[in-house]
């Protein structure tokens, strides 16, 4: 098995052309054709069909793509694992998280990480937890911090942070003086909601009995925008306690406990079970284990 042949095969499958793949890989078209012929001889199957000026994968080619990607990824992992043994963490930490986690959780963690490993560059993939998990599973992202629960037997999952959800109101809202608030009282207020995500799913479930009297004034994709509009008095929102510290500290807003139900948001560190983490990512996991993980180690979801 020649890894170079597999690289050529994957480029042709992406570009739909032997000549364009050759140009990208700085190889002549005859050399590209020879590599594919050798692969086809090895597997005993035709891998491409010509369709006009382009080429398309055969059924055998489609089957090979999955394994070709896996083999090349394993090659890179093995090279990284061996070279990392002789050096302190370098390279890039590829991490995924949603917007709120990037803004309100990661800065302190990254500051501690950077003090220990200044040579590591940090690359953040920002998206919803579901998308972050997809990127971890396909190997694009090394580790992710996502909202739990996560159900995936292919992932190692550690609980690292639990935050209380509270009602955020403007300082001028009469509820700002309340010691607590019920779901029914919240339902009487104009609502500013996230468009999607864990908190929105939780809200929709909790307030289903109050749907008739709910007034949703705004739906926003950004936690930062939600906080600004709540502070301006345009509505209320259920939000993680740690996300609203600045607004509470400045006096622009208040956080009111919800009395008839205990609401929390739990964050977890996730990464693939079957993959050797790059040294930079492994160092990040170790740092979080020291700072955040409970004494019993991995979250129960990882023990399946």
Tell where the protein language model's regions lie, with residue ranges.
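Short beta-strand-centered segments that line the small-molecule binding cleft or hinge
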Residues: 70, 85, 108-112, 129-165, ...
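A late-sequence structural motif
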Residues: 105, 254-298
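Beta-alpha-beta core module
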Residues: 152-159, 163-164, 178-179, 185, ...
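A short LG(V/I)-centered, amphipathic sequence patch enriched
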Residues: 18, 40-57, 62
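Short helix-boundary/capping micro-motifs
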Residues: 12-28
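Hydrophobic hinge/microswitch elements
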Residues: 128-133, 137-141, 146-147, 198-256
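Central regulatory/effector-binding core of bacterial HTH transcription factors
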Residues: 90-153, 211-213, 220
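Secondary-structure junction motif
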Residues: 189-210, 277-286, 292-301
């Amino acid at each position: 098995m020649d890894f170079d042949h597999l690289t050529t095969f994957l480029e042709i499958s992406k570009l739909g052309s032997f000549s364009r793949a050759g140009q990208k890989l700085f190889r002549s078209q005859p050399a590209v054709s020879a590599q594919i012929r050798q692969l086809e001889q090895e597997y005993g199957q035709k891998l491409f069909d010509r369709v006009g000026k382009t080429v398309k994968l055969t059924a055998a080619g489609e089957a090979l793509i999955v394994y070709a990607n896996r083999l090349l990824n394993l090659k890179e992992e093995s090279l990284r694992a061996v070279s990392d043994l002789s050096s302190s963490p370098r390279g890039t930490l590829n991490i995924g998280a949603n917007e709120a986690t990037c803004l309100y959780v990661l800065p302190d963690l990254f500051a501690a990480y950077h003090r220990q490993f200044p040579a590591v560059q940090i690359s953040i993939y920002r998206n919803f937890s579901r998308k972050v998990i997809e990127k971890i599973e396909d190997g694009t992202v090394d580790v992710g911090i996502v909202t739990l629960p996560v159900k995936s037997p292919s992932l190692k999952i550690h609980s690292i942070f639990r935050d209380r959800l509270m009602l955020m109101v403007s300082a001028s809202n009469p509820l700002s003086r309340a010691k607590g608030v019920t779901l029914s009282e919240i339902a009487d207020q104009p609502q500013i909601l996230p468009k999607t995500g864990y908190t929105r799913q939780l809200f929709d479930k909790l307030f289903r009995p109050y749907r008739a009297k709910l007034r949703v004034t705004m739906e926003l994709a950004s936690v930062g925008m939600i906080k600004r509009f709540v502070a301006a008095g345009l509505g209320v929102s259920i939000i993680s306690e740690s996300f609203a510290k600045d607004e509470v500290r400045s006096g622009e807003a208040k956080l009111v406990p919800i009395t008839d139900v205990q609401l929390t948001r739990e964050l977890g560190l996730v990464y693939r079970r079957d993959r050797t983490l790059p040294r930079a990512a492994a160092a990040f996991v170790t740092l979080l284990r020291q700072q955040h993980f409970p004494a019993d180690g991995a979250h129960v979801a990882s023990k399946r």
